[in-house]
Design a protein with these regions (language model features):
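Aromatic-lined, polymer-binding surfaces characteristic
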Residues: 1-8, 160
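Extended ligand-binding clefts on enzyme/binding-domain cores
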Residues: 5-111, 123
Length: 186
């Protein structure tokens, strides 16, 4: 598999070297995606998507604190966060997967909300992070499990429950908060 490692390294370097293409200056946020067309040009999907910012927060290194990352988070907060009576964060604008209430931008997803919470932890906004951890605990089913997403108007669970992904991100987030609150060693 050494050839695969070389290919992956080459692709990672290409992504890093072309990082600017991932940002939509008009929207002020990272793009949801793009498609390389047969003629070599790019077709962009400029939908506001929390996973695009999460990828930068988790994997981009020096771009983490960059102005474009901050703008992306601000766009997500102002456009998507807590825009329904149930609170939380849909994955992206006009997400219609299990769409239950079309007037809203999409159904709140626990995973998407926790990705933003992990950004808050990394930027030492612990009170804000804890607010959404409490929100998630409040939305658990009586058995203590979480679904994939919730109805934006009623807060009722939608899609599969339990969803291991929701639980895994909750554990990751709890560990991140715990680590962030540990006294720093001199």
């Amino acid at each position: 598999f050494p050839d695969d490692a070389v290919k992956w390294r080459r692709v990672a370097t290409s992504i890093h070297d072309n990082f600017e293409v991932f940002f939509d200056p008009q929207k002020g946020a990272y793009r949801k995606g793009f498609l390389l067309k047969e003629d070599g040009s790019l077709a962009f999907d400029n939908t506001l998507d929390v996973s695009s910012a999460f990828g930068v927060v988790m994997f981009a290194g020096k771009e983490f604190g960059a102005e474009k990352t901050l703008k992306s988070i601000e766009a997500i907060e102002s456009t998507l966060l807590d825009k329904s009576p149930s609170g939380g964060l849909p994955r992206y604008e006009k997400d219609d997967y299990f769409a239950s209430d079309p007037p809203h931008m999409g159904n709140p997803w626990f995973v998407a909300t926790l990705w933003l919470v992990q950004y808050y932890v990394r930027t030492q906004q612990i009170d804000k992070a804890k607010h959404y951890v409490d929100w998630m605990i409040d939305k658990a089913l009586p058995s203590g499990v979480w679904s994939e997403q919730i109805n934006p108007s009623t807060g009722e669970p939608l899609s599969v429950a339990p969803l291991v992904w929701s639980h895994a991100e909750f554990i990751n987030t709890a560990l991140d908060i715990s680590h962030a609150q540990q006294p720093k060693k001199p």
